[in-house]
Curated annotation (Swiss-Prot):
One of its GO terms (biological process) is protein insertion into mitochondrial inner membrane. Signal peptide: none annotated. The keyword Disulfide bond applies. It comes from the Eukaryota. It is found in: Mitochondrion inner membrane. Pfam families: zf-Tim10_DDP. The twin CX3C motif contains 4 conserved Cys residues that form 2 disulfide bonds in the mitochondrial intermembrane space. However, during the transit of timm9/timm10 from cytoplasm into mitochondrion, the Cys residues probably coordinate zinc, thereby preventing folding and allowing its transfer across mitochondrial outer membrane. Component of the TIM22 complex, a complex that mediates the import and insertion of multi-pass transmembrane proteins into the mitochondrial inner membrane. The TIM22 complex forms a twin-pore translocase that uses the membrane potential as external driving force. Belongs to the small Tim family. One of its GO terms (cellular component) is mitochondrial inner membrane. The lineage of its organism: Eukaryota, Amoebozoa, Evosea, Eumycetozoa, Dictyostelia. A motif (Twin CX3C motif) lies at residues 25-49. It comes from Dictyostelium discoideum. Heterohexamer; composed of 3 copies of timm9 and 3 copies of timm10, named soluble 70 kDa complex. Associates directly with the TIM22 complex, whose core is composed of timm22. Interacts with the transmembrane regions of multi-pass transmembrane proteins in transit. This is Mitochondrial import inner membrane translocase subunit Tim10. The gene is timm10.
Length: 88
């Protein structure tokens, strides 16, 4: 699998996760779309729902990769960024 195919697959997974969060949390927290903005209760509910969804996702991901929940998956060390000079 080349780099482009991996990036496409990663974007599909992210999109699927986002859609799952959107479906689950909007169905749970938003009963009617009467206003342009969420009220306080809807906003708090949605925030908690997304937080729980992400915590669950991290736990499942750590189980699948074989790491402990607080442990980070080792990644490649980032290349040293070139020194920036001036405004840009």
């Amino acid at each position: 699998m080349d780099d482009v195919e991996m990036k496409v697959m990663e974007m599909k997974m992210i999109s699927k996760m986002f859609q799952g969060i959107l479906d689950a949390c909007s169905a749970k927290c938003i009963s009617k779309y009467n206003e342009g903005d969420l009220n306080v209760g809807e906003s708090v509910c949605a925030e908690r729902c997304v937080q729980k969804w992400m915590e669950t996702f991290k736990k499942v991901q750590s189980k699948m990769s074989g790491t402990q929940p607080g442990q980070e998956v080792p990644q490649e060390a980032p290349a040293a960024a070139p020194e920036k000079k001036g405004w840009f």
